[in-house]
Every structure is written in structure tokens, then in C-alpha cells.
Curated annotation (Swiss-Prot):
Protein name: Elongation factor G 1
Binding of GTP, residues: 17-24, 88-92, 142-145
Membership in a protein family: Belongs to the TRAFAC class translation factor GTPase superfamily. Classic translation factor GTPase family. EF-G/EF-2 subfamily.
Keyword Protein biosynthesis carried by entry: yes
Organism classification: Bacteria, Pseudomonadati, Pseudomonadota, Betaproteobacteria, Burkholderiales
Amino acid sequence: MSRATPIQNYRNIGISAHIDAGKTTTTERILFYTGVNHKIGEVHDGAATMDWMEQEQERGITITSAATTCFWKGMDTSLPEHRINIIDTPGHVDFTIEVERSMRVLDGACMVYCAVGGVQPQSETVWRQANKYKVPRLAFVNKMDRTGANFFKVVEQMKLRLKASPVPMVIPIGAEENFTGVVDLLKMKAIIWDEASQGMKFTYSEIPAELVELAKEWREKMVEAAAESSEELMNKYLEEGDLTEAEIKLGIRTRTIASEIQPMYCGSAFKNKGVQRMLDAVIEFMPSPIDIPPVKGMDEDEAPVTRKADDEEKFSALAFKLMTDPFVGQLTFVRVYSGVLKKGDSVYNPIKGKKERIGRIVQMHANNREEVSEIRAGDIAACVGLKDVTTGETLCDPDAIVMLERMVFPEPVITQAVEPKTKADQEKMGIALQRLAQEDPSFRVKTDEESGQTLIAGMGELHLEIIVDRMKREFGVEANVGKPQVAYRETIRKTVEDAEGKFVRQSGGKGQYGHVVLKIEPNEAGKGIEFVDAIKGGVVPREYIPAVEKGINEAVTSGVLAGYPVVDVKVTLHFGSYHDVDSNELAFKMAAIFGFKEGCRKASPVILEPMMAVEVETPEDYAGNVMGDLSSRRGMVQGMEDMVGGGKAIKAEVPLSEMFGYSTTLRSMSQGRATYSMEFKHYSEAPRNVSEAIMASRAK
């Protein structure tokens, strides 16, 4: 079977934004104009196609990235048909992981901003993630029909807050209730959309007289941005003072794909204006899979290899999302980077070292699916039948093994105890939690060894709330949850050269004998636990060294101060002794545990607490109180900025333990007018009085 759409006509894009910037509505409109949705789904009524989980429709926020395919020939059907795969990404801070995993598999992103609220804290987080994966992007300023809408202020904010280089390609005609359309700076014509056909029809007309000068000024900036793409265009521009439409498009496309600039559009998705022009821009300026560098990975000998977006190459893909579907079971969403995958093929997972067979392949339109017999380079689809794949793993041709760069997932910062409301549901709850943890690598489940309680850990209170909610809806398990607990860590500050651990049991018959000497030193932050074998002359026999490492890995799960996991320590095994008869693996494992604990006690152990980047947006009258309150929570205020629509944005770094219940306090302090967002920043040493309180509460 040959390819239905040439690969150069593919666009894999994400639509990404702050909560309430109107991202889901924008996606809905895209699906409407591209002809797959005949009745527009409104988020206001909780009926949007992309928000397909019940909780999303209830809360009006998008949680999971649904992947959808649609086709577009341009607003005036003058372009060849392009296939656009859209991944809708959530805008809530607790779901940053979702954004991160979708950025990894996208070729381009469309950033949606609110014309009133402008660039919000979450927009900055998403922008940083797009920078990390070098994703080219364009911007769409939505809600131009709202009171206080200001397109040009958002342009300035993008430069200021995101250090972006936006290039407006259109300017708005009017604003608020007088917003009627846009001036297309490429054609220097006004575009007015017809309201009766929900924006399906439009007309080009002359630019309103009062906007002619402004349009010329912005066109000049756009042409200049295009000219900077090459010496050839720059020379022509300097000589003739202008460029043709084709030259401008080429220049803007080249610089957008190189992430040097971001074309900028505006409109009102709710009023069916402007989204159509932005769709054209996706085709004109976003890269196809062959416009971006080949994907990098390692072969089975760990030598670097690349895979081109080409059907002739061997198959390679990345599983970027798992979803449990009530009808077909587990769906594994994959982005194909190279080659072809047919229904019934076997694929190899190099991380698990396992071969699995693909049952069926489905392509999604939001929550509707269509079965396909094969997928090719550049495609995004869901596979049915894979039992043992976790998010972020590679799937490849068993005869040409490649391991693509893995995604890095953040460690959870908050823990809660959870138990089923009825004892009979215990097993059911276990299955549900395992399934959910497989889908979302930033969510973990473990059993507390002392209390036997089930603990769930995630990125924030809302994250865990939604997990508990999903257990109830999807698996029929109702659960009670304990108070949220902070995920503290322990580490050391000093080096101990000779930490000795001995495990000797010799009282007639076969005994036990293990003896190790360890050097224990602080490791770089974020480096984790590192084990080095520096044994010379066989003082500890080879076969016992894995047991020593196993002992260390066991010991680090519970630190010496308060039993929290130990991080960022380097352990070197450099001496020891053994007994011909009595030594065994268990003895060396125990010796390593004792040695490590002994060493940590002498190495100035400290407790680390998670610090959160908090941003509060408040009317000016309450700014003083907000800052005072953050300081009383051991917060460090790092700055205050003026916001677009008035008010102040206060940035601070605050320990997570001080932030529980903050939303209630903030609401009463500001009469419900201030809002805040927070995300995990890093771990830092807890002050002495805090550490003592933590240790005392753990000792109870």
C-alpha cells in the first residue's frame, strides 16, 4: 500500500496554552473547519471532542493529550491537501508531564494566549519545555472579542517574559465587541469572516482607512524578519525595499523551523474568527517530519545512530502515552520516526529486552477510532495488544535495534496514603493503581513496609485528586485518602573515607561473614546514587560485588535521620575481607547496608525539602499582604511585575510543606480575586528547626 499523503504534507503539531486561554475551543474549531466535526463542541457545555475523559468535561480543563488527525487544503482551498496530526496538551501545572511527553514527539507547536490575560506563568513553563525539545512554534492570540483584549500587549509580553521573537503576520481589526476580522500583512488585505456560516466563508476587502498606516508599519517588520533568513533575500530587500509574497513565506518558514522567530496570529475561536488563517500558517510555516533533523538514538552496542523520516528505513517509534480504553483495553500511542509498521508485525522493546506483537492499529479522532492496516514514518497512532510497554520507551524492528533518547520524568513531590472504602476492593484498587502508574510515569505507587498502607505519589494535590477520581470512574473503586505528605529526601554534606560494615555470625556450623570498607561522599545535585567498585587484589571476591551494590541500593531507600530516601551520594567500595567458607551474598549485602548507614551518620546527614516556584497574580491592593504571607511561609520573594490588565505578578520560591491549603488563604486574603500557580523547582536543605520537627514526627 502506498502512502496516502506525501510525508512533506504531514504536520505533527501540539496545541498548548495556559488554562482558560481557550485552547480546547481552538482545537474544536480546527476539527470543525477541517470537516471532521459537524457540530461544534463547546467547552462551556462540557461537550468538547478533545476533552474525552469525564473529569475533563466536568472540570472544563484538559488533562490528557488526545491525538487527532485531520486534513486541510487552506482557507481558500488553494493548497495541496495536508494531513495535520494534533496533540492537545493540558495547561494545568500538575500535568506538566503530559506537556513534556507530547513536546517530545511533536514537530511544531501552536501556543495559544488569551488576549486579555496575556502570557501567564504556565505559558512560561510550556515555552521552556518547547525550548528543551527545540520545537518550532507559532502563536495564536485568542479571545480578541473579550473586554480588555489587546493583541499588541501580548506581543510585548512574549518578548519580555518568554524572551521570544514574535512576528505578527496579521493585525486585528477592532477589539472587544468591535473585533470583526484581521488584516493579512502578506496580502495587505482585510479578511472578514462570515458569521452565518460559522466562519466557513470569508471575504477579502480593502484595509480600513484608520489601519492602513499601522498595517504598513507591521508589514515592514514582517518583511525585515523574512529578509534576515538569507543574504540573498537581505540584499534584495535592501535594493528594492520589499519582497514578493513567496519570498516572505520562504524567509519566515526558514527562520520559524530554525526556532529563530514565531509567526503570530489572532482571532476569537469562540466567534469563529482567525483560526482558519492560523491553520494555513501551520501548513505554510510549521515543519514536516522531513524538515527536522533525523532522530538520535543508540544501537545495541551503545554506538550513536540516527533514523531518518523515511519509509525505506528500518522501523522505529516512541511510545509516548498509554491509555486504558473500556472497549479494547490498553492503547499505546506511538510516534513513528522511520519505516513502516503493519498490523500483526512484531516489535522489539530494547529497554525491557522483549519482543511483542501488534494486534491492531487505530488512529484517533479525539475519542472516535478508525482501524488502519499500517502506519508509516511521521504517523501518530495507537497500537492495541502491547502488554509490557511503559511511557517513553522505544519500539523498533527486531532486526535493527535502536534505543531512542528516553524522556526524563520528574520525581513526585507529594505523597498520600490511600485505602479502599470496602476491604473487598483492596485487590481491585491495586490493579487500578498499577494501571494508572503505567500510564503516567510521574505518578508512583508503593506500600509502606511498616504500616502496610498503600501510598500514592504525584506532582501536586490536583494530580492525586484526579487519580483517585479516575479509580472511582474507570475501575469502580472508591477510596479514602489521607492527608498529603511531602516527599522529603536525605543526603550528606561531608566525605567519610572509611565507613566499615561487618556482618559476622559464627557459632558452630556454617556461619555468615561479610566485611566491606566504603568511601561515602556527596554527589552533584541530581546525580542520584553512584556506586564505584575500586577493589584491588580480590580482597572482596568478584562474585560478591553485585551483592554489595544491592545492599547499597536497599540502604538508600531509608535514610538515617528520618527514614526518607537518600539521594546524590557517591559510594566507593575500596576494601574489605572474606571467609572461604562462611562468606556469601547475603552476608556482603548486609555488611554493605551496615557500612552505608554507619558512614551516613558520620557524613553530616541533612534533610532536603522540595521547593516550589510559586507565582501569584493579584490586584495591587492585596500585593503587600500576599508578599507578607509568602514570607511567613518561609518563602523567598524573587520579584514583582506589572500585569497586562493591571495588578501584580509576584514570583517566589516556597517550601511545598508550607503551601498546603494555600488556595483557601489566598482566596480570603484577596476576596477571591487573586490566583496562583506553582510547580516543583528543586530540592534544598531544610533549616534545622524544620528538620528537627520532621524527625520528631517520624519518631512517633
